[in-house]
């Protein structure tokens, strides 16, 4: 991931300590604690350098996903960020995960989130969902990543788009523009809006953008 990447020589100067939990979390996350559960995964399974390390020696490319599922129970599916996949292709991945407690967490297509106004993305959004629904029970939360240039000035546009999404699906939103994190009232307002829609927010732990590692 290039976002937040810094030169290795500068890493020693970075304070990697996690921030304290803000007091407003109690108002945004009220109610009883649920049963804890952890899903662990990477951003892709097609890593040739894992053959002979994570994957058995001589593992063929067509078997990478099958081997990946032996080690992890989820994946941040970046592939769907760069291309809208049809139900046939998604169905093949879903079949490999059959019988496993495994979740595919597709990232929304960047043609929706990174190009132009969100109001004009009805067709692309429907096509994106048409494909990922083929994951069936293996469909995990959908990650909606907004670019570093998408700031709070477009808040109303963003919230209107999020409210239009299916209420029976789980979404996590990632914002990157520094202004979301610079002003506590702006960030708190965002968290409250997401909580009202039963949506989560992504926490990004990266060296060059410690502000995104919120709690």
PLM regions and their residue ranges:
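Residues lining hydrophobic/aromatic ligand-binding pockets adjacent to catalytic sites
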Residues: 1-215
